[in-house]
From Swiss-Prot:
Signal peptide residue numbers: none
Domain of life assignment: Eukaryota
Lineage: Eukaryota, Viridiplantae, Streptophyta, Embryophyta, Tracheophyta
Location in the cell: Plastid, Chloroplast
InterPro entries: Ribosomal_bS18, Ribosomal_bS18_CS, Ribosomal_bS18_sf
Subunit structure: Part of the 30S ribosomal subunit.
Gene3D superfamilies: Ribosomal protein S18 (4.10.640.10)
Gene Ontology MF terms in the entry: small ribosomal subunit rRNA binding; structural constituent of ribosome
Region named Disordered: 1-60, 149-170
Single GO BP term: translation
Chain positions of Sequence repeats: 4-10, 11-17, 18-24, 25-31, 32-38, 39-45, 46-52
Gene name of the record: rps18
Region called 7 X 7 AA tandem repeats, residue ranges: 4-52
Biased composition, class Basic residues, residue ranges: 30-55
Name under which the protein is recorded: Small ribosomal subunit protein bS18c
Length: 170
């Protein structure tokens, strides 16, 4: 078994080139060119259905007064969306960020969106006051559905217990 502590042993005979030159015409096995064709481009799925139009057109000016453009890059809570979500270049994202901040300072935009803040407020309070931190937060609709299913389960269990009590009394 070879271990790293053993030295590497060199062969005593030097490497020598073969005397016969290599020529392609003397090759014993030749492939026919008709059976195997090399395609210039490898097979790929077309990216056309996933191609999205850019969020900023060539004629759009990135300015704090252009509210229709700025509102596309702000979340429901009033936060500036990341570059990955926006699919913008670095330069465009920087200009959008500056325009949003300028619009906030000049009172064109609120710093927070208070209408949508109420949805997230109840969730954040439960996280702060909870006895243990939760890793995944529930979407309000799913939480409501989950709670209604739990209530139905509890009601069914109570009915079963009542039926057992009634049958045992007889």
């Amino acid at each position: 078994m070879y271990t790293s502590k053993q030295p590497f042993l060199k062969s005593k005979q030097p490497f020598s080139k073969s005397e016969q030159p290599f020529s392609k015409s003397e090759q014993p096995f030749r492939k026919s060119k008709q059976t195997f064709r090399k395609f210039k481009q490898p097979f790929r799925k077309s990216k056309q259905p996933f191609r999205r139009r850019p969020r900023i057109g060539p004629g759009d000016r990135i300015d704090y007064r252009n509210m229709s453009l700025i509102n596309r890059f702000i979340s429901e809570q009033g936060k500036i969306l990341s570059r990955r979500i926006n699919r913008l270049t670095l330069k465009q994202q920087r200009l959008i960020t500056l325009a949003i901040k300028q619009a906030r300072i000049l009172s064109f935009l609120p710093f927070r969106n208070y209408e949508n803040e109420k949805q997230f407020q109840a969730q954040s309070i439960s996280i702060i006051t909870g006895s243990r931190p939760r890793k995944n937060r529930h979407i309000p609709q799913l939480t409501q559905k989950y709670n209604s299913n739990r209530n139905l389960r509890n009601n069914n269990q109570n009915l079963r217990n009542n039926n057992r009590n009634l049958s045992s009394d007889c």
